[in-house]
Amino acid sequence: HIVVRRQRQMCIRDRKNIEFKSLALIVVDEQQRFGVKQRFDLASKSQSEEMPHQLFMTATPIPRTLAMTIFSDLDLSIIDELPPGRNPVKTVVLSNDKRLEIVNRLQKVCKDGNQVYWLCTMIEDNDSFDVQSAETSLEWIRENAPELRSELVHSKLSNEEKEKNIIDFRNGLIDILVCTTVIEVGMDVPNASLMIIENAERLGLSQLHQLRGRVGRGPNMDSYCALLYQDPVSENAQQRLEALKKYSNGFDISEIDLELRGAGELLGLKQSGGIDFKISDISRDAQLLKLSQSLTERISNLESTKLEKLIDRWIGQDQVYIKAQ
């Protein structure tokens, strides 16, 4: 049997009574959206003593996951090409002061018969944050481009209104969909060719790359993503935005994310943060780690007499080792 369920249906606390008699394989899509404990809970839902096989799929591995592939705790397979007919999304980084200049681009895109996502990090204005909200942006777009059909999608709308606007956008009845990160996964509109992301400095690399992937899904279409930022921008945020501008491959972006945020706890729950190595650097020394793993495998396959000679040569009388039984 195959069971297909959403993350929330399987992982929340009141689902502890869900168990499988013989769980053999777990396939997790959009793995970056799951926490460490959630993935562990999934694997522990089998009544069998054998650990089920696990296949994780993601366009942008989180730092901890990428580090686990480096330490050989996870086997890695990479699809390093786009689906047939798709072109990379061209990305530009612009100050929020350039908003008016974008209107001309919006009008051209929609005149050519294509559609636009305009993404905001907040639904409503908040005096505590200097950010553009979805509701304010919708008003601004309607004021500056009244001929274009624009609507909202965010989590505070009723399910009926949200679904109607999404369906209308898919059917080409809406030119500009002003939205929040609710459209990060599950939206496939091949006619959408432009993504505007307000206050992009507030979002992480993985999420920005996922959002950018909502456009460029049509065959042989030139698509664009504009990352708008609000000054002042931290050095870390500048590096994130430049990485999105430079790289289109999710694994390249994940490596930058690993360098910027750290690998987290390989044996704990943190999925990012520094590893307290005193000398080694996990990103810089990844090739050395692979070499050491290769040598370790070769040594472990040696005959016991040769292995004992090597251990004695390297360790001598300073260490005591116990031969595995």
Residues covered by each model-derived region:
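Inter-lobe coupling/hinge segments of SF2-like helicase ATPases
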Residues: 6-9, 13-242, 306
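Accessory helical-bundle/CTD segments and flexible terminal tails appended to RecA-like ATPase motors
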Residues: 167-176, 183-190, 195-198, 213, ...
